[in-house]
Amino acid sequence: MFLLHEYDIFWAFLMISSVIPILAFLISGVLAPISQGPEKVSSYESGIEPMGDAWIQFRIRYYMFALVFVVFDVETVFLYPWAMSFDVLGVSVFIEALIFVLIPIVGSVYAWRKGALEWS
């Protein structure tokens, strides 16, 4: 039989953690001063007046480097627990981790050969 009262603490935590942000937004909406003006609709760039158009397109090259960074960053996050328990796991898990590392490396070499990482 599934006992619902075992999860009372979870449901209380869920309700409290949902109510607190909602109350914070409601209270700040009621107490905040309403001010309209040119400063309210202007772009904010570290306290400096924006120069030119606020909408500047970034080149796709930035996204390529960001994507490569994210792939290797996520790979590092997944490899860290494996490295901490390396002595317990054994050779089969080492081979799996090696394959896991080789797949992004092969993908990076392929992208490099195709010119996806060229800056020009």
UniProtKB/Swiss-Prot annotation:
- Which GO terms label this protein's molecular function in UniProt? NADH dehydrogenase (ubiquinone) activity; quinone binding
Q: Which Pfam families match?
A: Oxidored_q4
Q: Name one GO biological process term.
A: photosynthesis, light reaction
Which EC number applies?
Answer: 7.1.1.-
Q: How does it sit in the membrane?
A: Multi-pass membrane protein
Q: Which domain of life is it from?
A: Eukaryota
Q: Which GO terms describe its cellular component?
A: chloroplast thylakoid membrane; NADH dehydrogenase complex
Which sequence ranges are marked TM in the entry?
9-29, 64-84, 88-108
- Localization of this protein: Plastid, Chloroplast thylakoid membrane
Where in the chain are disulfide-linked cysteines found? Answer: none
Keywords per UniProt: Chloroplast, Membrane, NAD, NADP, Plastid, Plastoquinone, Quinone, Thylakoid, Translocase, Transmembrane, Transmembrane helix, Transport
Q: What is its main location?
A: plastid
Which reactions fall under this protein's catalytic activity?
a plastoquinone + NADH + (n+1) H(+)(in) = a plastoquinol + NAD(+) + n H(+)(out); a plastoquinone + NADPH + (n+1) H(+)(in) = a plastoquinol + NADP(+) + n H(+)(out)
Describe the protein's quaternary organization and the partners it interacts with.
NDH is composed of at least 16 different subunits, 5 of which are encoded in the nucleus.
What functional role does this protein have?
NDH shuttles electrons from NAD(P)H:plastoquinone, via FMN and iron-sulfur (Fe-S) centers, to quinones in the photosynthetic chain and possibly in a chloroplast respiratory chain. The immediate electron acceptor for the enzyme in this species is believed to be plastoquinone. Couples the redox reaction to proton translocation, and thus conserves the redox energy in a proton gradient.
* Family classification: Belongs to the complex I subunit 3 family.
Alphabetical list of PANTHER family matching this protein:
NADH-UBIQUINONE OXIDOREDUCTASE CHAIN 3
**This chain belongs to which protein, by name?**
NAD(P)H-quinone oxidoreductase subunit 3, chloroplastic
Give the species this sequence originates from.
Answer: Amborella trichopoda
